[in-house]
UniProtKB/Swiss-Prot annotation:
It comes from Thermoplasma acidophilum (strain ATCC 25905 / DSM 1728 / JCM 9062 / NBRC 15155 / AMRC-C165). InterPro entries: HicB-like, TA_system_antitoxin, TTHA1013/TTHA0281-like. Pfam families: HicB_lk_antitox. This is UPF0150 protein Ta0767. It comes from the Archaea. Belongs to the UPF0150 family.
Length: 69
């Protein structure tokens, strides 16, 4: 499954990543690469937990749009 992720850099210099389609699924890393590796693991664990509890796995219906202002 593919999921849209949002990655931002916090005031301490860490990259924070979250998955809008999976509430509460987020992680961080010292580098973008580390943060993206971590979010893949977090997504797998999140989905595994949903399956274990016989819960529906959300589909990603996000649309990516960049707006320049």
């Amino acid at each position: 499954m593919k999921y849209t992720v949002i990655i931002t850099k916090d005031e301490d210099g860490y990259y924070v990543v979250n998955v809008p389609a999976l509430p509460g699924c987020f992680t961080q890393g010292k580098t973008k690469k580390e943060a993206l590796i971590n979010i893949k693991e977090a997504i797998r664990a999140y989905i595994e937990s949903l399956k274990k509890h016989n819960e529906k796995i959300p589909r990603d219906n996000a649309e990516e749009i960049t707006v320049h202002a």
